[in-house]
């Protein structure tokens, strides 16, 4: 039996990096988006990767601390979802309400139900669905 030779993969330096300032702005915008979506604190914390209750309470008062890479990615995906909804619905209120409506594409569940499964891949899948719906392929 022979093992395959594996070539090391180097990290790509050309990918965009979310700076600390951008992450703080994303956090403030995420708080506002969650207000528009009328999320409960528990729902908001789940979408943010099971954020601690105390941390979420601080965020709501504008006290944003250190934001790790996973959380930055989650917030960026959530902003992509919001942007896609704004493209699909000219009336922002319709887009905000859409996330709670049952959807045949999600076996009768809402987009929020899909996102509340809690995995970052659930957010990615919803973003991909919305991009396909708006014809961004």
Which residues does each PLM region occupy?
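Non-transmembrane "mature" sequence context
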Residues: 1-137
